[in-house]
Amino acid sequence: MDNNNMLNEMIENPEEAIKSITVSDLGYSVLQPQYFNQFVREATRNQTILSEARRIVMDAQVVNIDRTGFSNRLMEDATEDVAPTGTNPAFAQEQLIAKEFVGMVGINDRSLRRNIEKQNFQSTLISMASEKWGEDWESLAVFGDTTKYSTGDLLKSQDGWIKKATNKLYGTGTGKDFTGTSVAIDELMKQMLQAYPKNYLKNRSNLRFYLPSELFDDYIDAVGQRPTYVGDDATGQNIARPYKGVPVREATVLNDTEGADTTKGYGKVAMLMDPNNMVYGIFQEVGIEPDRQPKLRKTDFVFSAESDQGFENPGVGVVALYNETKPSS
């Protein structure tokens, strides 16, 4: 089939056109494994936090995340004819519960016929959808909160990492942990490190400071004041050196208009996390269905995916909330 015939086929019979990238069951089409992998890879690779967090491909709507650990010492002094007292491991469990989300990409017939990708159009379609999907996905994973935002808002549909983290520092209110209106960024980062569980500070290079652009610039400026090559690199090349061994990342998702709104959202946020402790899951089937609109001379491609996010251990990490009031105890 030549290019023109192929494109005409996509316009006139879009269901046939996507057969090469999907597996159909009872009229519902899901991406083949290689295209599923492409969708997830391209959705996450440009997202600072999502690309570093640990991904689980879910084979069921509910997946348990188990962890074990010891709350007391295991090793003890040996005494002849005396049995060790023994230490039982503590078990805990978190859950990922996949929720379905949908999105639509509309392409008019003229654009489709002029498409320069020709036979690679199906892959291009996935790339178009996954890139934007990834931006929204990361915003939800970070800022999601079922008790905030307006009804119908994407960020209200699930709880994200900020909501699920148990260690929080507050910048306003009685008993606040820091003064959100005036604290220096390096002072706040020092305080966040102090609040981080000490047992999990063994390898600081595995941790991350995630900062919105404003705070990242403040950190660059603070480092840039040093009369050294480190200061020159910071201001001249926008290089953020690690803070006390912890890499510092600019996470543009923390600039999200809704999530960072001081009235409906969380406002300004800084995070100190171990990405391997931040878990997100996506159900192994991503759906795609064409919806032909002949009167409008266009075809809408409806994507659907199920996902959730959480922690292996919600107590390992620190979130600093500049504009949130510390709850009364």
How would you describe each model-predicted region?
Residues 187-224:
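Ordered core of a single globular domain
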Residues 23-106:
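Assembly/oligomerization interface modules of large self-assembling protein complexes
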Residues 141-146, 203-212, 233:
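Short coil/turn segments at secondary-structure boundaries
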Residues 74, 115, 138, 218-220:
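Short helix/loop capping segments that flank catalytic or ligand/cofactor-binding pockets
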